[in-house]
Structure formats: C-alpha cells, structure tokens
C-alpha cells in the first residue's frame, strides 16, 4: 500500500464516521500549489459553501506574497473565507474532514482560522 492509497483509506474511514453523525462536513483538499475547502450538507450530496486559492479575490490578496497558494498564509485566508461563507449559509457547526492528510501545517492553519472566525468543530 503506497502513500496515496493509505491517505484515501484514512479519508474513507473518516467520511463513514461523519456520515453516521448526520452533520455538515468541512472537507479540505491540499495540493502542492493550492488548498480547497468545501462545506457539504448533512446528507453529503450538496456543497453549501466553498473556498479555494483559485478564487480571483484570494489570488489578488496573495499576489503580493511569495507563492500562489501552497503556504500557511494562504490556508489561513481560506479558513477565514470558508467560515464566513458557511455562517452566511446558516451553518454554525461542522465536522472537520481532513481527507486523510495529517493535521499539521496548512491543514491545521485552515482549521484554526475557521475556528477563530466562528465555525464550531
């Protein structure tokens, strides 16, 4: 079993447990250059809010910094944006789905920023 298969196995187990809870899910996906966050409905079929480093507003804010979006500063910005969008959609609490990634670095920065912006998990 290689690194990617292990991550996907962990992600699958997490999603099964979150589905049993029937709560909104904040899913994070990380690549070398970007980070993405989505809030899914409790049934898991609809995306209620999303934010990523590919958005024009985010890219403009990150333009003065080095890198495009593969750093902790970008993850912090995305965490704040996803919390604001989720609260605007009427979602106060979510279950955090790290998609099998270690809770460290950019994933942790996004989660901490979302908590500071008022999202509960």
UniProtKB/Swiss-Prot annotation:
Origin superkingdom: Bacteria
Q: Does the keyword Heme apply?
A: no
| GO molecular function annotations of the record | 5S rRNA binding; structural constituent of ribosome
Q: In the UniProt record, does the keyword Ribonucleoprotein occur?
A: yes
- Gene Ontology terms, cellular component aspect? cytosolic large ribosomal subunit
Q: Which cysteines are joined by disulfide bonds?
A: none
Q: Spell out the InterPro entries in the cross-references.
A: Ribosomal_uL18_bac-type (IPR004389), Ribosomal_uL18_bac/euk (IPR005484)
GO annotation (BP), single: translation
- Enumerate the UniProt keywords alphabetically: Ribonucleoprotein, Ribosomal protein, RNA-binding, rRNA-binding
UniProt cross-references to NCBIfam families, sorted A to Z: L18_bact
Function field: This is one of the proteins that bind and probably mediate the attachment of the 5S RNA into the large ribosomal subunit, where it forms part of the central protuberance.
How does the annotation summarize its subunit structure?
Part of the 50S ribosomal subunit; part of the 5S rRNA/L5/L18/L25 subcomplex. Contacts the 5S and 23S rRNAs.
Q: Which family does it belong to?
A: Belongs to the universal ribosomal protein uL18 family.
Q: Which PANTHER family match?
A: 39S RIBOSOMAL PROTEIN L18, MITOCHONDRIAL, LARGE RIBOSOMAL SUBUNIT PROTEIN UL18M
Q: What is this protein called?
A: Large ribosomal subunit protein uL18
Report the source organism.
Answer: Paraburkholderia phytofirmans (strain DSM 17436 / LMG 22146 / PsJN)
Give the lineage.
Bacteria, Pseudomonadati, Pseudomonadota, Betaproteobacteria, Burkholderiales
